[in-house]
């Protein structure tokens, strides 16, 4: 049997936590001049993925 491989794109985007996975928010990389300071501040940091997506992420990352 071959080794089970993780999806390399998903491995770069999601980090495992005690209660699931966290990810970086989108809309924060470029074209930031027209976005308000409040919006950019709220997009900072990592967020938890929704419960509906948890099983899909676990299937893509079996070794985490």
From Swiss-Prot:
A Gene Ontology cellular-component term: cytosolic large ribosomal subunit
MF terms in GO: structural constituent of ribosome
Any one of the GO BP annotations: translation
Taxonomic superkingdom: Bacteria
Keyword Ribosomal protein: yes
Coiled-coil region(s): none
Family: Belongs to the bacterial ribosomal protein bL35 family.
PANTHER family: 54S RIBOSOMAL PROTEIN BL35M, LARGE RIBOSOMAL SUBUNIT PROTEIN BL35M
Protein name: Large ribosomal subunit protein bL35
Gene that this sequence comes from: rpmI
């Amino acid at each position: 049997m071959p080794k089970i491989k993780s999806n390399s794109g998903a491995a770069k985007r999601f980090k495992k936590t005690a209660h699931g996975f966290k990810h970086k928010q989108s809309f924060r990389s470029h074209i930031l001049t027209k976005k308000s300071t409040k919006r950019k501040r709220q997009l900072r940091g990592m967020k938890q993925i929704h419960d509906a997506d948890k099983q899909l992420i676990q299937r893509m990352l079996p070794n985490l």
